[in-house]
Amino acid sequence: MPAREYNYVEGFGGYGSLDDDDSDRDSERRNHDLGQRTITTSPTGVSRHAALNRYMIPGRINPLFRPTDAAQPPIVSTSTSASATEPTNRIGPGRIKETPETNFNAFLIAQLTRMEEQNANLKEEISLMKKEQELFFLENQKKLEKGFKDINKYVEDVSAMKEVFKEVVGIMTGERIRFIDHTGENVTPQEAARVGNPSTSTQAHQSQSRSTNWQEYSMHASILAGDPRIKPEPGLSDFENGEYDGNESDENATTRNLPLNNPDSVSNADDSNNQLDGTGNENDIRNRRGCVGTSYKLNRAIQNVTDAAREYFEGLPGQPSVLSLERRYGSTWRRSAKERTLFTKRMTIIKRIIDIKDDPSKYGLSLPENKISRNQAIKVVENIRLGNNTFKGHHCRLSMSQLYEYFSKKMDKLEDYSLTLKRRGKPRRIFLLEEREARLSLQQPHSIPNSSTGTPEHDQDT
């Protein structure tokens, strides 16, 4: 059965049958080509119809496989030469066949039209988005400019406040003399002199601070005086006058090397010491019951490692130990900056004692079974303070602050750690005075003769 031919109708957007064409168009075509013959369908035409069916809209009936009408006349096959010479095909008498290229071109035109519409919509959306982004950018740009202006204003205000604070601090410390014109003011000359001379108030504050510190030091020294195990540190005058004997390195060693927790070490104390011990015990009980821990201050009168270790591990007479305060209160008991600074310095020394006790071989100490007691570790650090050091090129008798500096700046060496005192040092100030005297002697003119003995230069001149 021959398939019915369909033509693309542009007005309705689909394919229509040739039977629906108007009669005027058919008659016009018949009058135009009266001598043409019917042409048989070639395989090439069939393949073109198949290609056209692939581009058909889904849901429509394929015209190549549509059942044919019984009234339609069959297509009469003719010779090949006639199909080659005739450009136009006819189906039945007086009916013109449309080529598949025309339908395919119409389909492409429709698709291109739809793509152009989509492109136009996309262009409109892009332009709208562009306008929105411009508005968003302008709005944020205004906010940023306003924020930068506010920041500049805040910076200027803070700079002005800093300048004011500098002036106030300078006036309070006396670095900047405050100028006030008292002309025409109702003030007394004494008040004007007091206001015009800020150094007076500064000196009064310094003297008051010194008196407070001295009172605090005296109180701490009295606490240390209640313990007969504590030996006072020799003063600078003892070294200058030669009253301090360097051979007394092992004096009172039995008292100092007793265990820190041995109560029998004070058995030779007199009755007054016993009374002090009783008072200390009562104070200890009262302090433990009260809230002494939160108001405790480190003893400023401590001058050696032994007393510092006793304060940390055991506690001074009538006072709790720093170790118990750390375990109970943490860092809340040292509230002021001075206490925190002093505690840091003391803990540097205490940690070195603990480290030596835990691993003595790390510091070159050869001991049986690599074990050392706490008292021996304290003695090692105390020997470093007394002279087993090379603090700035000399064997110095270090203070607690200098010992902290010696450890914190890692100036110590392995040969410094020893249970025996190799060499007793002198205070740092003695070496500084000797160096100063040596410089002054070199700077003196050689022409001035000595009253006792003549110099070689003077002998040559004479």
UniProtKB/Swiss-Prot annotation:
Function description: Transcription factor-like protein that binds to specific DNA motifs called ub-HS-motif associated with several locations where proteins other than histone H2B are ubiquitinated (ub-hotspots). Ubiquitination at these sites depends on the SUMO-targeted ubiquitin ligase (STUbL) complex SLX5/SLX8 and protein turnover on the CDC48 segregase. UBC9, SIZ1, or SIZ2 sumoylate DNA-bound EUC1 to stabilize its DNA-binding.
Keyword Nucleotide-binding: no
Coiled-coil features, chain-numbered ranges: 105-135
Top-level taxon: Eukaryota
Polar residues composition-biased segments: 197-214, 252-282, 441-455
GO molecular function: DNA-binding transcription factor activity, RNA polymerase II-specific; RNA polymerase II cis-regulatory region sequence-specific DNA binding; sequence-specific DNA binding
Annotated protein name in UniProt: Transcription factor-like protein EUC1
InterPro entries tied to this protein: HOT1, TF_GCR1-like
Other known facts: Present with 238 molecules/cell in log phase SD medium.
Modification after translation, per record: Sumoylated at Lys-231 and subsequently ubiquitinated by the SUMO-targeted ubiquitin ligase (STUbL) complex SLX5/SLX8.
Subunit structure of this chain's protein: Homodimer. Interacts with SLX5.
Chain spans, region Homodimerization region: 81-140
Impact when changing residue 334 to A: Leads to complete loss of association with ub-hotspots
Subcellular localization, as worded in the UniProt entry: Chromosome
GO cellular component, one term: chromatin
PTM sites of type Phosphothreonine: 254
Record region (Disordered): 11-43, 66-97, 190-214, 226-289, 441-462
Pfam families documented for this protein: GCR1_C (PF12550)
Gene ablation phenotype (knockout): Prevents ub-hotspot formation and exacerbates heat sensitivity of cells deficient in Rpd3L histone deacetylase complex members. Leads to the up-regulation of the expression of the Rpd3S complex subunit RCO1 of the Rpd3S complex and down-regulation of HSP12 and SIR2.
Record note on domains: The coiled-coil motif is required for homodimerization.
